[in-house]
């Protein structure tokens, strides 16, 4: 901008325009959810990401710790929530305001669940050998399989979780034995059995003739909360 001053005798002077400009920006940023919060999860400081076509200041419906300061770049920006309580989050929003003060569209984040509750305490059930000459409470040279049965609580959060058997020789520490198994909906409120080979047993640290092997299990829910059973 500039100005012309004219006196009463019609003499005029045009002012200097230095420092009197306005940049015109009436276009709002456009943003979208680029990476959703992992769900369900026991992470109380979850992460998500947005894509913006402009840099600008981020506004989120919850407190965030990153980025700090809370500014988005043109492109993908990863955002980390401050500590959240356990629960279901279905109305969290994010927007961006550019340097000119234009506000973007408001994005509602995909619903996510934070679950910090571990599975209930449990006691490992039966341990039964099979193959060859079966004698209760013994693993002999003719046995080929040891089946460990574990009770599974009727808790929907366990569906998609895992069951891992552990074992130890007396005087040693518990260690994973065999592969973990996925807990299915049909296992809820019942039991789940894991078959171990004699080779699995013989690979335990300290295994030898005359030793005693103790079994336990770890149940982990779909949010990665875990509980170790009583042997």
Residue ranges and their predicted role:
Residues 1, 91-92, 215:
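Hydrophobic beta-strand segments within extracellular beta-sandwich modules
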Residues 28-53, 120-142, 146:
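N-terminal non-catalytic regions of secreted/periplasmic and cell-surface proteins
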Residues 11-12, 18-29, 34, 108-128, ...:
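Flexible, low-complexity linkers/stalks enriched in Thr/Pro that connect modular domains
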Residues 1-3, 231:
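Intrinsically disordered, low-complexity linker/propeptide segments enriched in Ser/Thr/Gly/Pro
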Residues 9, 15-18, 40-43, 55-100, ...:
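Extracellular beta-sheet repeat scaffolds used for adhesion and glycan interaction
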Residues 21-23, 30-35, 49-51, 78-82, ...:
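Generic structural detector for well-ordered beta-strands
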Residues 5-7, 96, 219:
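Conserved structural position at the C-terminal beta-strand
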């Amino acid at each position: 901008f500039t100005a012309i001053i004219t006196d009463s005798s019609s003499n005029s002077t045009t002012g200097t325009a230095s420092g009197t400009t306005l940049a015109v920006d009436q276009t709002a940023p456009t943003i979208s959810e680029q990476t959703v919060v992992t769900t369900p999860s026991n992470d109380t400081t979850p992460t998500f990401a947005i894509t913006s076509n402009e840099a600008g200041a981020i506004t989120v419906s919850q407190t965030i710790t990153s980025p700090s300061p809370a500014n988005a770049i043109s492109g993908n920006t990863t955002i980390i929530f401050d500590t959240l309580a356990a629960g279901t989050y279905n109305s969290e929003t994010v927007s961006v305001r550019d340097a000119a003060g234009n506000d973007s569209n408001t994005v509602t984040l995909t619903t996510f669940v934070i679950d910090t509750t571990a599975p209930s305490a449990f006691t490992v059930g039966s341990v039964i050998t099979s193959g060859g000459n079966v004698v209760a409470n013994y693993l002999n040279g003719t046995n080929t399989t040891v089946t460990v049965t574990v009770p599974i609580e009727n808790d929907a959060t366990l569906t998609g979780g895992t069951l891992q058997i552990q074992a130890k020789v007396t005087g040693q520490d518990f260690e994973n034995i065999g592969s973990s198994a996925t807990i299915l909906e049909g296992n809820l409120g019942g039991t789940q059995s894991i078959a171990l080979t004699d080779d699995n047993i013989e690979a335990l640290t300290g295994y030898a003739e005359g030793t005693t092997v103790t079994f336990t299990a770890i149940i982990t829910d779909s949010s990665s909360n875990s509980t170790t059973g009583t042997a």
